[in-house]
Amino acid sequence: MEYEAVIGLEVHVQLNTKTKAFCSCPNTFGAPANTLTCPRCQAHPGTLPIVNKEMVHKTIKAGLATNCTIQKKSRFARKHYFYPDLPSYYQITQMDEPICTEGHLDITVLNDDGSSYNKSIRINRIHMEEDAGKLVHDDTGRPLSYVDLNRAGCCLIECVSEPDISTGEEAYQYLTELKKIFKYIDVSDCNMEEGSLRCDANVSIRPKGSTELGTKTEVKNMNSFRNVRLAIDYEIKRQIKALNNGEKILQETRLYDAKENTTKGMRSKEGAADYRYFPDPDIPLLVLKDEEIEQAKKELPELPQQKRERLKKDYDLPDQDIVVLTEDAALADYYESAVKAYPKQPKKISNWIMVEVNAYLNKKLQTIKDFKPKAEHIAEIFKLIDEGVISGKIAKEIFEDMCETGEAPSAIVEKKGIKQVSDTGELETIIRKVLEENPKSVADFKAGKEKSFGFLVGQTMKATKGQGNPKLVNEVLRKILSE
C-alpha cells in the first residue's frame, strides 16, 4: 500500500521584548542563573500577572506578516502540568480564543531533479504564552538537576500550522521562511542555539488519497532546521515500516537522536483534557482597538517574498542571487545601497557581496551590520575597475584593507600607490624591455607557438608588479609583436 505523510508544526518563538510576559524582569539571554527573577516568576502566592503591551504588539505584527486574522478579543488560559522548571505548575497561554487565526505561508520547494513547486501552508493560530524555566543537569554523573528560572515567564508566541506539510523538505522551507519573516519584522532573533526558536513536529501517515488522519506522534529535540527535516523523514519511514509489519502506531512523544538519526519513544502523548485548560481568572479579556492593529500594520517592512519579487524586477538577478541577498534584510539593503551608488554593475556587485563580503563575515562571525566598509565603497570598487584605475586582482587586495580600516578604495589606492598602469606609452616601454630580455619567446611566438604569448604577458605583469591593465597589456603586446 502507498502512504502519504500528514505533518503539522508547532513553532515556539521567543519575542525580543525588553521585559517578560507578565512581570517587569529583564528578558535577556546569558545572565547568571536565577538573577533575572522576581516573586511573580517564582510563582509566590499572591503575585498577579500584568500583560506586557510590547508582547501583544509584536504578536499582532507576527500575525499580520503571516496573513492571519487579528482577533480584537482574545483570552489567556492556564495549562496545567507538573515539571520542576514550572514553579506555578501551570503555564499562562491561550487556548480557545487566540489572538491570531487563519493565516498562511507560501513556500517554494525544490525537487531532486532541480524542478520546483509552490505550496501554501495554512496557519491555524498564533497565540501568546509564557516560557518555562530551564533544567541544568549535573555533568558529574550524579542524579541531580538544577533549576534556572531566568527564562521562566519570558514572552513566547506559538505558531501552529495546519497539517498541510507532506515532507521533511517542505517543513524545512516553511521554517526557513517563517524565520526570515520574524527576523524581518524584528519580533525575534530566532536563534535556535539560544532557544529563541524551537520546533515540534506532529507526524502521521495514511493511505494515499484517504481523508482520515492516522495516529500522530510528536517529535521533539530538534535543534536545527536540518534536524527537523531528517527527523521527519525518518519518522515517516518508521511509521510506514511499522504499518507494513502489522504494528500499531502509538500516540506518543518521541525524541530525535541526531547522532543515530532516529526517533525514540519518550512518553505517551497527552491530550488537551490532560492539561485541564481553563480561563485565567487573574487576567481580564484582552480587547484590542482598531488603531492598535493599524499601528502594527504601518510598522511592517517589506517582507521577504515582496523583496524577492522586487529585486527580480528591478535588477534582473538570478534566483540564487536573490535567495542569498534576501536571507537577511540588512544584507539586501546593503546591496541596494551599493547599486544605487553605481547602477552600471548590479550583477557584479551581487557576486562580490555573495562571495567576498559573505566569506569575510563568516570568517569573522559577523553580520553585515558589523561590516566596516560602506555600501558605497563596494560600488566604488567597480567604478574604479570600469575606469581602468584598478584591476580585479588589485580590487581583492584593497578589499582586505577596506575590511580592516573601513577606508574608501580610492584612498587605499592613493596611499599604497597601487593604481593600475593604463598609460599606453608607459606599457609600451615596459613591454619592449620585456621582449628584449626574452628573445627566444619572441621567436617562438612568431613561429606560431601561441603559448609563448602567455609567457610574455606574465613577464609584463611581473614587470608592472601586477599593476598593468590586463586588457591593454594584451593589446599593446600583440601590436608590438606584429611589427
From Swiss-Prot:
Q: What Pfam families does the annotation carry?
A: GatB_N, GatB_Yqey
Key word Ligase present: yes
Question: What Enzyme Commission number(s) does the record list for this chain?
Answer: 6.3.5.-
One GO term in the molecular function aspect is: asparaginyl-tRNA synthase (glutamine-hydrolyzing) activity
User: Which reaction does this chain catalyze?
Assistant: L-glutamyl-tRNA(Gln) + L-glutamine + ATP + H2O = L-glutaminyl-tRNA(Gln) + L-glutamate + ADP + phosphate + H(+); L-aspartyl-tRNA(Asn) + L-glutamine + ATP + H2O = L-asparaginyl-tRNA(Asn) + L-glutamate + ADP + phosphate + 2 H(+)
What biological-process terms (Gene Ontology) are attached? glutaminyl-tRNAGln biosynthesis via transamidation; translation
Its domain of life? Bacteria
Enumerate the UniProt keywords alphabetically.
ATP-binding, Ligase, Nucleotide-binding, Protein biosynthesis
Complexes and interactors: Heterotrimer of A, B and C subunits.
What does the UniProt function comment say about this protein?
Allows the formation of correctly charged Asn-tRNA(Asn) or Gln-tRNA(Gln) through the transamidation of misacylated Asp-tRNA(Asn) or Glu-tRNA(Gln) in organisms which lack either or both of asparaginyl-tRNA or glutaminyl-tRNA synthetases. The reaction takes place in the presence of glutamine and ATP through an activated phospho-Asp-tRNA(Asn) or phospho-Glu-tRNA(Gln).
The family classification in the record reads: Belongs to the GatB/GatE family. GatB subfamily.
Q: Know the name of this protein?
A: Aspartyl/glutamyl-tRNA(Asn/Gln) amidotransferase subunit B
Species the sequence originates in: Brachyspira hyodysenteriae (strain ATCC 49526 / WA1)
